Amino acid sequence: MKIALVIFITLALAGCALLSLHMGVIPVPWRALLTDWQAGHEHYYVLMEYRLPRLLLALFVGAALAVAGVLIQGIVRNPLASPDILGVNHAASLASVGALLLMPSLPVMVLPLLAFAGGMAGLILLKMLAKTHQPMKLALTGVALSACWASLTDYLMLSRPQDVNNALLWLTGSLWGRDWSFVKIAIPLMILFLPLSLSFCRDLDLLALGDARATTLGVSVPHTRFWALLLAVAMTSTGVAACGPISFIGLVVPHMMRSITGGRHRRLLPVSALTGALLLVVADLLARIIHPPLELPVGVLTAIIGAPWFVWLLVRMR
């Protein structure tokens, strides 16, 4: 059943990736997907400069956000934990928007570093305020901090109205206009981070038994928590720097896949990565074809999917 699930998700991902290249305001014929990859062909510019970069970003950012959600849920043993619910997304967004508004000439390659610093600062403050891994308190504290970071972001935009357009589009969580400059920065980092997450599989499995038992079985709990959390924040921040704050993938996908595959992280992490990539590719495709030529922010569609799921989880855990 698990192998069949992986095959199904992989085939669905491949099919949606082809549809993403094919569909849009300017449809690309299926034959052109095989032939028009060299300069001078009719659909070369649409494929190479517009659709392929955003498809690659959707694949890797979706996978990274889902894996970050798995890591955070495993670290705190909390099914409500995710980068966006805990406020990491919004803290990273605040740092990135501050850079976009206050230092507009800043190179794109610096954004992931600033987003990472903002995400880590938000996570440290959350740990200081919550002082517990109790699911409801963590979730509520994270939501409160998210509102705080969002308010500060709004203040920054109101104080710099002349520079607000790019920041406003970026804040909705969008793949629109993403070119190879974003791909060259974000994807090498994702290629480094995603395999590293597999090194935590055994320790996260043992952490699920409780800190005391995990320590008895040879896990350095503080060491594992620190490095796994650092990796999760790094993946989230890189995704935020590339595409803006895309909500709920880190919450919905890990929880859904855990209910299907079980809690073994060696299975859960790869399946969640594939499903996160699939969800973001589908959301980006729908964002382009629902109301052409207008394009919806992809973050709006992921929020429409994820918000009811989060409410259902809260109600079920009462």
UniProtKB/Swiss-Prot annotation:
Changing R288C: Retains 65% of wild-type citrate-mediated Fe(3+) transport. The keyword Membrane applies. Changing R54E: Retains 24% of wild-type citrate-mediated Fe(3+) transport. It is found in: Cell inner membrane. One of its GO terms (cellular component) is plasma membrane. PANTHER family: FE(3+) DICITRATE TRANSPORT SYSTEM PERMEASE PROTEIN FECD-RELATED, FERRIC ENTEROBACTIN TRANSPORT SYSTEM PERMEASE PROTEIN. Residues 24-55, 127-137, 201-225, 291-294 are periplasmic. Gene3D superfamilies: ABC transporter involved in vitamin B12 uptake, BtuC (1.10.3470.10). The complex is composed of two ATP-binding proteins (FecE), two transmembrane proteins (FecC and FecD) and a solute-binding protein (FecB). Interacts with FecB. CDD domains: TM_ABC_iron-siderophores_like (cd06550). One of its GO terms (molecular function) is iron chelate transmembrane transporter activity. Signal peptide: none annotated. This is Fe(3+) dicitrate transport system permease protein FecD. The keyword Metal-binding does not apply. It comes from the Bacteria. InterPro entries: ABC_BtuC-like, ABC_transptr_permease_BtuC. Belongs to the binding-protein-dependent transport system permease family. FecCD subfamily. GO terms for biological process: intracellular iron ion homeostasis; iron import into cell; siderophore-dependent iron import into cell. It is a multi-pass membrane protein. Residues 1-2, 77-105, 159-179, 247-269, 316-318 are cytoplasmic. The gene is fecD. Keywords: Cell inner membrane, Cell membrane, Ion transport, Iron, Iron transport, Membrane, Transmembrane, Transmembrane helix, Transport. Part of the ABC transporter complex FecBCDE involved in citrate-dependent Fe(3+) uptake. Probably responsible for the translocation of the substrate across the membrane. Induction: Induced 1.3-fold by hydroxyurea. The chain crosses the membrane at residues 3-23, 56-76, 106-126, 138-158, 180-200, 226-246, 270-290, 295-315.
